[in-house]
């Protein structure tokens, strides 16, 4: 019985990691075409209206149910926090936390104003009785990612080098929001530290969720790893994420609130 219980907890932990990876992959605005790469790599942050970029969605909160079939296993919560200073510049700050039975995964994400390219991520994973801390630092000029993992008193460091800007985690929907028009057939490439995917907008559908009914853009990945639904309005809210395979773990939006730039919340359905 104890062995079976351990296997179930391990399966749930792997599922959450998989869902988090899917969430990261989905929203990349890095098309295969070279002009998209140039747009991200050559952008001058000093020329952007940083104040507007930093404050537009401050206070936003999205709550998701984590499901396997019709069973709810726990929840994930995304928060857009007040901008902070990092290395002498004002940057975006966001958090993403997943909680299941005896498992939690907390992330604090710092990203550049305007581009939303990740600069620093602090992560804490609790898989009872074990605790792991992960620090990620991104050099978007040299296209490198330095990862330091700490368990107890033991730390290990890994450096990943890529051929272009590196994206990560929950910040990617904000890049998608800046695309003026989306049409069926539109595609983008996901350039993650460990793997690349192509994401294609396959259809426009009506989606019924615990948070309400939405018209949604339906994206599918190639290779076939996941499906994603994003609201078909100016907010481009990530509504639902479904992983492929026999486990069928899914993130489904339960609640959405939009802040007033000062962190106070208003229901924006």
Regions found by a protein language model. Name each.
Residues 15-25:
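N-terminal signal-anchor transmembrane alpha helix of single-pass membrane proteins
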Residues 23-140, 178-269:
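Acidic, serine/threonine-rich low-complexity disordered tracts
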């Amino acid at each position: 019985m104890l062995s079976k219980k351990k296997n179930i907890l391990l399966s749930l932990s792997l599922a959450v990691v998989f869902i988090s990876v899917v969430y990261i992959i989905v929203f990349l605005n890095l098309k295969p075409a070279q002009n998209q790469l140039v747009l991200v790599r050559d952008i001058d942050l000093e020329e952007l209206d940083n104040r507007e970029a930093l404050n537009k969605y401050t206070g936003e909160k999205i709550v998701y149910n984590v499901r396997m079939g019709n069973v709810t296993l726990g929840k994930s919560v995304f928060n857009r926090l007040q901008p902070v200073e990092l290395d002498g510049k004002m940057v975006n700050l966001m958090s993403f936390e997943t909680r299941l039975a005896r498992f939690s995964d907390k992330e604090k994400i710092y990203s550049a104003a305007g581009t939303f390219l990740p600069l620093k991520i602090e992560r804490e994973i609790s898989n009872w009785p074990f605790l792991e801390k992960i620090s990620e630092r991104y050099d978007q000029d040299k296209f490198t990612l330095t990862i330091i993992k700490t368990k107890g008193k033991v730390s290990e460091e890994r450096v990943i080098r890529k051929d272009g800007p590196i994206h990560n985690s929950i910040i990617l929907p904000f890049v998608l929001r800046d695309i003026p028009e989306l049409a069926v057939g539109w595609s983008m490439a996901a350039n993650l530290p460990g793997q690349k995917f192509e994401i294609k907008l396959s259809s426009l559908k009506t989606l019924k969720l615990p948070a309400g009914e939405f018209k949604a853009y339906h994206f599918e990945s190639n290779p076939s790893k996941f499906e994603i639904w994003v609201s078909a309005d100016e907010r481009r809210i990530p509504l639902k994420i479904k992983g492929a395979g026999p486990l069928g773990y899914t993130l489904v939006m339960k609640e959405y609130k939009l802040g007033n730039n000062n962190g106070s919340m208003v229901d924006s359905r």
